[in-house]
Amino acid sequence: MRVVKVKKTVVIIGGGAAGMSAASRVKRLKPEWDVKVFEATEWVSHAPCGIPYVVEGISPTEKLMHYPPEVFIKKRGIDLHLNAEVIEVDTGYVRVREKDGEKSYEWDYLVFANGASPQVPAIEGVDLKGVFTADLPPDAVAIREYMEKNRVEDVVIVGGGYIGLEMAEAFVAQGKRVTMIVRGERILRRSFDKEVTDIIEEKLKQHVNLRLQEIVLRIEGKDRVEKVVTDAGEYRADLVILATGIKPNIELARQLGVRIGETGAIWTNEKMQTSVENVYAAGDVAETKHVITGRRVWVPLAPPGNKMGYVAGSNIAGKEIHFPGVLGTTVTKFLDVEIGKTGLTETEALKEGYDIRTAFIKASTRPHYYPGGKEIWLKGVVDNETNRLLGVQAVGAEILPRIDAAAAMLMANFTTKDAFFTDLAYAPPFAPVWDPLVVLARVLKF
C-alpha cells in the first residue's frame, strides 16, 4: 500500500533566529512541505547581538547574517521573501506588502517569529538626525554611516541595560567621550544584585560619565542632535543611542485573536503552540516559563529564541518535543570586566517568596603561584528548605565557564552539596584546585 504524503503550507512571520530555526527544522523533517518565510527587512538569520561590535568597527556589517539568503533558498528549499511586511493575519491566510504590491498567501500552520521592537521614549527630539536605536542590523549600518559623515566626539547613551553597556564599550573603544544616563539607581538593576553591579560600575565610571537617577526630558538640536537635557543637567551630544528597552511585536497576533500572556508577549505552551489551533510563536515575541519558579516570563535572548524556533518547527512537522523553559542565563562585559548570571537573584528569590541564604565571594582564576590570575566575584542564592541552588551571579574575569556550569546545575536541580562535589577540571594554567564555583558552594554550606 502506497503512503500518500499530504503537502502542507507553513507560513513564518519573521526571518530572524527563531523564524529561520523553525523554517529549517520543518524542511528537514518534511522536505516536501511548502515553507514560506516573510521578513520585513533585507536581513535574514541576523545577529542583533553583534551590533555593538559592528559599531566599534571590529566586525564587518555583513557578518551580522549567520547565513546569506541563498543558503535558505537554494540549499534548504525555503521560500524566503525579503522586504516583505505582513500587514494582516486571519484564519488560513496572511496579507503581505512586497515590492510589487500586496499579496495574500494561504497557510495550514502559522508561526509568529516577528520579534520585538525598541521602546522609544515619548520625548521631544527622538526623531533628530544622530539619534538611533540599536536593535537590528540596519541600525548598525546607519550608525556607522553617520559617524563616517559627521564629526562625532560626544556620545550620549540613554539606558543602563545590556545594550546600553555594550554600546558604551563600543564608543569608549573608539576614543569617544561617553555619557550614560540611567533612570534607576544603578545599571543592570533588573538583572543583578547591587554588590555585583557595584563592581562593574566602578570600572564604568573610569571611562564613562555615568549619570544615575536622571530622567531625560528632551533631545535638542537644529539640523542634527546637539544636546540631551535631563532633570539634572545638559549634556553635549553629537550622537545619541536610545537603549531604553524593547517590547514584543504582538499586533499581528492580536488580529488573529491569539492569547497574550501576563508578560505582554504571546502565550505559548511547551510545544510553542499558541491558544489558536495550528498557530505557534517563538523567539522574542513569545513568553515561556521560568525553569525554577514555573512562572510565566518573557526573556528575549538569542539562545532560547533559537531553541524555541527549533521546538516549534519540530512539533509542526510531527516530531513532538517540549521546550523546558528558561533560566535567564546572560553574560556581557565592559572592557575587561565581565558580568553574568543564571537563575534567580536574591531580589527575585525574595519576591517569589523563597526562604533563602546567600553568599558573595572573591576568588582568583588561577593558583597563587601561576601567572595571569585575575579576580572573580561570585554570588549564590540557595533555598533554605531544600538546599537547592536557585541562582548564581558572577563579575570579574573568566566568568563564562562558571556561569555555564551553574546553568547546568540549575537545570538539574543541584543542591549546594551536589555543586560542591561536582568533578570540575583542574590544572594550574586553567583554574585553581578549588574552583571559585566550588568555593561558593562550600561557603553556601550544605
From Swiss-Prot:
Reported cofactor(s): FAD
Annotated GO MF terms: CoA-disulfide reductase (NADPH) activity; flavin adenine dinucleotide binding; NADP binding; NADPH:sulfur oxidoreductase activity; protein disulfide isomerase activity
EC numbers for this chain: 1.8.1.18
Binding positions for CoA per the UniProt entry: 28, 45-49, 66-67, 76, 306, 362, 434, 442
Pfam family, one: Pyr_redox_dim
Active site annotation, chain numbering: 49
Catalytic activity from the UniProt record: hydrogen sulfide + NADP(+) = sulfur + NADPH; hydrogen sulfide + NAD(+) = sulfur + NADH
Cofactor note text: Binds 1 FAD per subunit.
Keywords linked to the UniProt accession: FAD, Flavoprotein, NAD, NADP, Oxidoreductase, Redox-active center
Binding of FAD, residues: 17-18, 39-40, 46-48, 86, 284, 302, 426
Role of this protein: Catalyzes the CoA-dependent reduction of elemental sulfur (S(0)) to produce hydrogen sulfide.
Family assignment from sequence similarity: Belongs to the class-III pyridine nucleotide-disulfide oxidoreductase family.
Protein known as: NAD(P)H sulfur oxidoreductase (CoA-dependent)
